[in-house]
Amino acid sequence: MSVMFDPDTAIYPFPPKPTPLSIDEKAYYREKIKRLLKERNAVMVAHYYTDPEIQQLAEETGGCISDSLEMARFGAKHPASTLLVAGVRFMGETAKILSPEKTILMPTLQAECSLDLGCPVEEFNAFCDAHPDRTVVVYANTSAAVKARADWVVTSSIAVELIDHLDSLGEKIIWAPDKHLGRYVQKQTGGDILCWQGACIVHDEFKTQALTRLQEEYPDAAILVHPESPQAIVDMADAVGSTSQLIAAAKTLPHQRLIVATDRGIFYKMQQAVPDKELLEAPTAGEGATCRSCAHCPWMAMNGLQSIAEALEQEGSNHEVHVDERLRERALVPLNRMLDFAATLRG
């Protein structure tokens, strides 16, 4: 495949880590956020990969902690007039596309995603134009502009089922942007899939040799893997799935020790689900030159207590998500198709 933009060779500048807060500062911001949420008629919608203290705050204030599909559902149905989306930018955009009448706030609008960055809309449009006979399916981890070009949007929790459905209709697929997830879905369904070559900087760093050594050290452990991981890591898994599916697998598997190959932010909810089980991080070869993300998305880490308080307190463009209305209407079509399809799966 030849594209103008090569995600494999792209180096994304990582944001600086937030300044650590003292115990007193954390307590101050937690109480301030709780008060501001009530004053703004706002609710928190947080992703599993945000830091534990952010997820805990969402729980305590009646918010949502979930994968991107459930975040979209929850935000669209909740009566609050303001959604505080703790995650990365495409999640805030998706919330605005589905709920244009609501105010969508984010702790920072600079929280990117390597999959989103790795799929620039101009190059992606050219790629799609070169293959006009293919149905365009894009992962939720994309910009509003890329979604607007798609026929379908999909999350990892329903990717296999959707592609299996489209394949049964004889459709050939363009899949973007995650090459590992695309390869996994193709292997599961046998579909005719042409993949864009993006990757998640967290999951792409899991190392087979290091995971093998950890498995040898803990032979009684089950391995849970997100399908954004390289094929060699997926092949070692006892369970493969989206964040919500991995939490469900943790409960179902009989093993008392679990090696988890996804962003370590998931440990907060997974440990709640299996309090008596031991959770181990799958290795990325450790902190230092051999890994950049080291099993935690640096942009998810930008969602801090101080920035959440600022988003709720300060009106204006520094925190509010805006999506062009014509673009929003186009992106809404494949998003609604995803939600309708997901609803049929739920029965």
From Swiss-Prot:
Task: Give the subcellular location.
Answer: Cytoplasm
User: Which BP terms does GO give this entry?
Assistant: 'de novo' NAD biosynthetic process from L-aspartate
Matching SUPFAM superfamilies, A to Z? NadA-like
Cell membrane recorded as keyword = no
Q: Which reaction does it catalyse?
A: iminosuccinate + dihydroxyacetone phosphate = quinolinate + phosphate + 2 H2O + H(+)
Q: Which GO terms describe its molecular function?
A: 4 iron, 4 sulfur cluster binding; metal ion binding; quinolinate synthetase A activity
Which pathway does it serve? Cofactor biosynthesis; NAD(+) biosynthesis; quinolinate from iminoaspartate: step 1/1
Print the keywords alphabetically.
4Fe-4S, Cytoplasm, Iron, Iron-sulfur, Metal-binding, Pyridine nucleotide biosynthesis, Transferase
What does the record give as EC number? 2.5.1.72
Principal EC category: transferase
Looking up Gene3D superfamilies in the UniProt record yields: NadA-like (3.40.50.10800)
Q: How is the cofactor bound?
A: Binds 1 [4Fe-4S] cluster per subunit.
Query: Which cellular component, as a GO term, is one annotated location?
Result: cytosol
Q: Per its UniProt entry, which superkingdom is the organism in? A: Bacteria
Q: Which InterPro entries match?
A: NadA, NadA_sf, Quinolinate_synth_A_type1
Q: Does the keyword tRNA processing apply?
A: no
Required co-factors: [4Fe-4S] cluster
User: Which HAMAP family does this UniProt record tie to the protein?
Assistant: NadA_type1 (MF_00567)
Query: What is stated as this protein's family in its record?
Result: Belongs to the quinolinate synthase family. Type 1 subfamily.
PANTHER family reported in the protein's UniProt record:
QUINOLINATE SYNTHASE, CHLOROPLASTIC (PTHR30573:SF0), QUINOLINATE SYNTHETASE A (PTHR30573)
Its biological purpose: Catalyzes the condensation of iminoaspartate with dihydroxyacetone phosphate to form quinolinate.
The name this protein carries in UniProt is Quinolinate synthase
Identify the species of origin. Escherichia coli O139:H28 (strain E24377A / ETEC)
